[in-house]
UniProtKB/Swiss-Prot annotation:
Protein family: Belongs to the Gfa family.
Coiled coil: none
Listed pathway(s): One-carbon metabolism; formaldehyde degradation; formate from formaldehyde (glutathione route): step 1/3
Protein name: Glutathione-dependent formaldehyde-activating enzyme
Gene: gfa
Co-factor binding comment: Binds 2 Zn(2+) ions per subunit.
GO annotation, biological process: formaldehyde catabolic process
Domain CENP-V/GFA: 22-169
SUPFAM superfamilies: Mss4-like (SSF51316)
PROSITE patterns membership: CENP_V_GFA
Physiological role: Catalyzes the condensation of formaldehyde and glutathione to S-hydroxymethylglutathione.
Signal sequence, renumbered to the chain: none
Length: 191
């Protein structure tokens, strides 16, 4: 067992599967009062550890843990006025609390994007149990961009594999296939 810390929610092991019939919960920012709350009224999918430099990570974590849910199942229920988009030029518009910096959800506004209609959420911000479990790690090499020395990458990949999170330097094969199929449909090559 390696000593590399990936993320507090997976470092002790990854609980497999989500609770049968689970229908979501409430995400809360980290502010002591006047918390931003977001209701997610569905189970998440494609939960994964993400090493990209844009995703919100708790202090000391090399990766975020993020999943997707249909955007119609995401609703800000308190203190929407505290939310601000982190980077307006990014594909995923990450809505962060201006008080504590936590990203509550990310939304793709480009209707031509393959993942349009899906919002990105960090289920660790919820007290409810039963969310889908992480199943892979994406954008692993990107942690170098946030300060991880390249010589540690073999150990990081070994730890991800040990946790049952296959490491990819892009998305999982199923998600990459979905992106490519979307492009092929737009070109008229698939229907």
């Amino acid at each position: 067992m390696t000593s590399v810390s990936i993320h507090p929610s997976v470092d002790g092991g990854v609980a497999r599967g989500g609770a049968e019939g689970f229908q979501g919960g409430t995400l809360e920012c980290h502010c002591a009062s006047d918390k931003v709350t977001v209701e997610v009224s569905a189970q998440t999918a494609h939960n994964h550890a993400c090493g990209c430099s844009k995703c919100w990570k708790p202090d000391g974590a090399k990766f975020s843990v993020v999943a997707v849910v249909p955007r119609d199942n995401v609703e800000v229920t308190a203190h929407q006025e505290k939310l601000k988009i982190v980077d307006e030029s990014a594909t995923i518009q990450r809505h962060a609390c201006t008080g504590c910096g936590v990203h509550l959800y990310g939304r793709i506004e480009n209707k031509d994007h393959a993942f349009y209609g899906l919002d990105f959420v960090h289920t660790e911000l919820s007290k409810q149990q039963g969310w889908s479990a992480p199943g892979f790690a994406a954008f692993v090499s990107s942690i170098i961009e946030t300060g991880t020395p390249p010589e540690q990458m073999d150990e990081v990949r070994a730890r991800l594999t040990e946790l049952g999170l296959p490491p990819y330097d892009c998305l999982s094969p199923a998600l990459m296939d979905a992106l490519s199929a979307h492009v092929a449909r737009k070109k008229g090559l698939l229907h």
